[in-house]
């Protein structure tokens, strides 16, 4: 019998998740299907309940439903609790739903695979929304020496720094307080997609700075264009994070680790990168 999985979102037609998980299943010889479900904005809970009632084994959740998914769970991982959002649902043997958040693990895995080890690094996280919140604990657990957060609205950055203060060395800084020459800079803000980058000082970058944009597309992102012009030594977009978080979800469902590297190359080829 084929096990059913799906990704829920609105919109969802652009999702790469069905392709990614279908390739993971082929690699690991798993008997499973994976589809994309367009959930009504006002009917997400009903869509999820119907899916699991009809035999669904697990699901991914994307915008705008990650916070709603959080509230539907009977059990939550520590990552999901701190993120305040769920992107992975697992149906347990007793029928209860466990929620997890694999976004941050996907980010860390991709940075360490493609850029540099995060251990003992000074890291700047740009943005203080849901994408940032979901990644802070994995970044701290990766052993960063210092994690600074900056955001247009400073209060949001302060709230995140306070929430995660017991997990590591984390500070909220205004744009004028930022240090010089960070080891790694991560952009979690989606503002660049609309052509409105946060006005960051170029002094935060030197010739040894690695930059990572959680966004991705067929062209170099605006943030990475800016970072390269400011002298960053290397930049990456978030396509690998997408594949990395999917690999973590796949492991939670099937207890097997897929090869993310080959699937990421297939995606890059499809995007003409």
From Swiss-Prot:
Known catalytic reactions: shikimate + NADP(+) = 3-dehydroshikimate + NADPH + H(+)
Family: Belongs to the shikimate dehydrogenase family.
Gene source species: Shewanella denitrificans (strain OS217 / ATCC BAA-1090 / DSM 15013)
Enzyme class: oxidoreductase
Oligomer and partners: Homodimer.
Keyword Thylakoid listed: no
Protein name: Shikimate dehydrogenase (NADP(+))
EC number: 1.1.1.25
GO cellular component: cytosol
Protein residues bound to shikimate: 15-17, 62, 87, 103, 216
Role of this protein: Involved in the biosynthesis of the chorismate, which leads to the biosynthesis of aromatic amino acids. Catalyzes the reversible NADPH linked reduction of 3-dehydroshikimate (DHSA) to yield shikimate (SA).
Active site positions: 66 (proton acceptor)
Pathway where this protein functions: Metabolic intermediate biosynthesis; chorismate biosynthesis; chorismate from D-erythrose 4-phosphate and phosphoenolpyruvate: step 4/7
InterPro entries: Aminoacid_DH-like_N_sf, NAD(P)-bd_dom_sf, SDH_C, Shikimate_DH, Shikimate_DH-bd_N, Shikimate_DH_fam, Shikm_DH/Glu-tRNA_Rdtase
């Amino acid at each position: 019998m084929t096990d059913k999985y799906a990704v829920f979102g609105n919109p969802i037609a652009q999702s790469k998740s069905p392709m990614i998980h279908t390739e993971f299943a082929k690699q690991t010889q798993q008997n499973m299907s994976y589809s994309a479900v367009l959930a009504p904005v006002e009917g997400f809970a009903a869509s999820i309940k119907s899916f699991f009632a009809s035999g669904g084994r697990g699901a991914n959740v994307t915008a705008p439903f990650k916070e709603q998914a959080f509230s539907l769970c009977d059990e939550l991982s520590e990552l999901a609790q701190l993120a305040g959002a769920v992107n992975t649902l697992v149906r347990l043997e007793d029928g209860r739903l466990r929620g997890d958040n694999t976004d941050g693990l996907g980010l860390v895995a991709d940075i360490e695979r493609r850029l540099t080890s995060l251990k003992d690094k000074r890291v700047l996280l740009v943005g203080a929304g849901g994408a940032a919140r979901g990644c802070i604990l994995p970044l701290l657990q990766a052993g960063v020496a210092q994690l600074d957060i900056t955001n247009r609205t400073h209060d949001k950055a302060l709230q995140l720094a306070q929430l995660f203060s017991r997990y590591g060395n984390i500070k909220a800084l205004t744009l004028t307080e930022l240090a010089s020459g960070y080891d790694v800079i991560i952009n979690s803000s989606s503002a660049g997609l609309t052509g409105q980058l946060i006005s960051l000082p170029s002094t935060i970058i030197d010739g040894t700075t690695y930059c990572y944009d959680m966004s991705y597309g067929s062209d170099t992102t605006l943030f990475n264009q800016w970072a390269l012009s400011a002298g960053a030594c290397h930049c990456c977009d978030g396509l690998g994070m997408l594949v990395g978080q999917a690999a973590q979800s796949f492991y939670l469902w099937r207890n097997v680790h897929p090869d993310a590297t080959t699937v990421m190359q297939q995606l890059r080829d499809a995007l003409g990168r």
